[in-house]
């Protein structure tokens, strides 16, 4: 029987099928952080239960960590307590822990791949929505709640109904200035934030085949924003080249055998999907969001649609525009902005900083812009320095901060003030997401760079 990539990975991890119920599903890799894990560990302790496979769980501090002066004690009491709890729990149960200052520390969905923990054909969970990032490697990866974190810690399994399957094909050649973030935002704009509900998505077509692993991670990261359970891309030579030699990746003969198996992880020619979407790469231009969900995105040269042109309630749509201070039929180009955020598990990798630096090189940060440039990990931070990118950023008037989730969800001090506009390379533009009253415009690193040096929304293609 022909199978999709998703079927092959899912079916190989089902421990038991429950009639008219969810599957008992084995988890290969489990990532935890300081926010969603403390209560799960309290549950274990209250039941007198141990962590079944501590070597399959990895802990990193990221969500509410400061991005300056990380060598000093964390000032916020709640954050300090959560960070200490993560360290204590990891030590007690024998779990690898990369806290503040550790050379491997960083955002969970950045450090997993860069250390070779994320592998093709694996099942991966974390108490975080954007766990779908790891699907870029041909893994099944999705976010879970705190009670499920406890379940995985104690049993290494989870109860999960099998989602339906959707394939999104993007073929053709992307225009200059259009990158993975634009592709993802375009897809979400087409499907809406609920169009993927109930599905696990496979991204296919030559656009994804030609993407780097960093680009694929950006796309899979945003799968959850169309309502999907997750997204994945079949592993290929690009995947293998990225993983070879990384710390937790197989070595020697084990590597050879692993690659041999990974090459089988692709959808069979006559496999059937429950839904399919076809997109022409040439239709995608640099994207920008204008509302309060990631599906409210348009090409930078387009006008904001009228309420009658979009799905959903007219009252809700107008409320969203009012929150953003925009009107129907507004042109986005030329709108002044106040903040720029480069970072997050969506766009905090070395490729994103290279793209940003390419635009700002030889230019200066606009005086009206406050910029937060936050690498996704210490490894990325080191690469920025080694490649001379830091020199370019410094010359242009930018300051590099220390790794963490930062302004993506503003759990630390990196908060956008009320009423201010932030061009952000993160993944969510909900009301107050980056601080109470903040106004978020989701964009690619290139778009963010263009805004940072001009002080307003600018078509980045004009700066090449």
Swiss-Prot record:
InterPro entries in the cross-refs = 3-IsopropMal_deHydase_lsu (IPR004430), Acnase/IPM_dHydase_lsu_aba_1/3 (IPR015931), Acoase/IPM_deHydtase_lsu_aba (IPR001030), Aconitase_4Fe-4S_BS (IPR018136), Aconitase_4Fe-4S_dom (IPR036008), IPM_dehydratase_rel_enz (IPR050067), IPMI_cat (IPR033941)
Which keywords accompany this UniProt record? 4Fe-4S, Amino-acid biosynthesis, Branched-chain amino acid biosynthesis, Iron, Iron-sulfur, Leucine biosynthesis, Lyase, Metal-binding
Taxonomy, superkingdom: Bacteria
So what does this thing catalyse?
Answer: (2R,3S)-3-isopropylmalate = (2S)-2-isopropylmalate
Q: Name one Pfam family in it.
A: Aconitase
* Cysteine-cysteine disulfides: none
Please name the gene that encodes this protein: leuC
Record PANTHER family = 3-ISOPROPYLMALATE DEHYDRATASE (PTHR43822:SF9), HOMOACONITASE, MITOCHONDRIAL-RELATED (PTHR43822)
Q: Which pathway?
A: Amino-acid biosynthesis; L-leucine biosynthesis; L-leucine from 3-methyl-2-oxobutanoate: step 2/4
Q: State the top-level EC class.
A: lyase
The Swiss-Prot or TrEMBL record describes its family as follows:
Belongs to the aconitase/IPM isomerase family. LeuC type 1 subfamily.
Entry EC number(s): 4.2.1.33
Molecular functions per Gene Ontology: 3-isopropylmalate dehydratase activity; 4 iron, 4 sulfur cluster binding; metal ion binding
Kindly provide the name given to this protein in its UniProt entry.
Answer: 3-isopropylmalate dehydratase large subunit
Q: What is written in the cofactor note of this entry? A: Binds 1 [4Fe-4S] cluster per subunit.
Its assembly, as annotated, is: Heterodimer of LeuC and LeuD.
- Lyase keyword on record: yes
Residues binding [4Fe-4S] cluster, per UniProt: 345, 405, 408
Which coenzyme or cofactor does it need?
Answer: [4Fe-4S] cluster
Q: Which CDD domains match?
A: IPMI
Name a biological process GO annotation: L-leucine biosynthetic process
**What role is this protein assigned?**
Catalyzes the isomerization between 2-isopropylmalate and 3-isopropylmalate, via the formation of 2-isopropylmaleate.
Q: Does the keyword field hold Lyase?
A: yes
């Amino acid at each position: 029987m022909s199978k999709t990539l998703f079927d092959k990975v899912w079916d190989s991890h089902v421990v038991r099928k429950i009639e008219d119920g969810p599957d008992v599903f084995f988890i290969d890799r489990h990532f935890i952080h300081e926010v969603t894990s403390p209560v799960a560990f309290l549950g274990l302790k209250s039941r007198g239960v141990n962590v079944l496979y501590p070597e399959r769980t990895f802990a990193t501090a990221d969500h509410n960590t400061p991005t300056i002066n990380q060598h000093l004690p964390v000032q916020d009491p709640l954050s300090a307590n959560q960070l200490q709890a993560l360290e204590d729990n990891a030590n007690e149960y024998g779990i690898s822990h990369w806290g503040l200052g550790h050379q491997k520390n960083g955002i969970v969905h950045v450090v997993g791949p860069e250390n070779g923990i994320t592998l093709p054909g694996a099942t991966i969970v974390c108490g975080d929505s954007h766990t779908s990032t790891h699907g870029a490697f041909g893994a099944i990866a999705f976010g879970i709640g705190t009670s499920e974190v406890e379940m995985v810690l104690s049993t290494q399994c989870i109860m999960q109904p099998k989602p339906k399957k959707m394939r999104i094909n993007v073929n053709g050649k992307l225009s200059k200035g259009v990158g993975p973030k634009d592709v993802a935002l375009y897809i979400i704009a087409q499907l809406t934030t609920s169009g993927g509900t109930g599905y696990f998505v496979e991204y296919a077509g030559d656009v994804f085949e030609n993407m780097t692993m960093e680009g694929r991670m950006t796309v899979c990261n945003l799968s959850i924003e169309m309502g999907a359970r997750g997204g994945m891309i079949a592993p290929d030579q690009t995947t293998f080249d990225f993983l070879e030699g990384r710390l937790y990746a197989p070595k020697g003969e084990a590597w050879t055998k692993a690659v041999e198996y990974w090459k089988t992880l692709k959808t069979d020619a006559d496999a059937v999907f429950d839904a399919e979407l076809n997109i022409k790469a040439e239709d995608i231009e640099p994207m920008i969001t204008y509302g309060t969900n990631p599906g409210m995105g348009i090409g930078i040269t387009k006008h904001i649609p009228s309420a009658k042109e979009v799905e959903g309630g007219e009252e809700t749509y107008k409320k969203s525009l009012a929150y953003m201070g925009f009107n129907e039929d507004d042109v986005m180009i030329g709108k002044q902005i106040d903040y720029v955020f480069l970072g997050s598990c969506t766009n905090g990798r070395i490729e994103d900083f290279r793209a940003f630096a390419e635009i700002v090189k030889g230019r200066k940060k606009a005086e009206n812009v406050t910029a937060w440039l936050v690498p996704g990990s210490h490894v990325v931070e080191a690469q920025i320095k080694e490649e001379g990118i830091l020199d370019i950023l410094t010359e242009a008037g930018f300051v590099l901060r220390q790794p963490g989730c930062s302004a993506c969800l503003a759990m630390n001090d990196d908060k956008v003030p009320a009423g201010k506009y932030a061009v952000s390379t993160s993944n969510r533009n909900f009301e107050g997401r980056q601080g109470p009253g903040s106004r978020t415009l989701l964009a690619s690193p290139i778009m963010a760079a263009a805004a940072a040096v001009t002080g307003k929304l600018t078509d980045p293609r004009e700066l090449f």
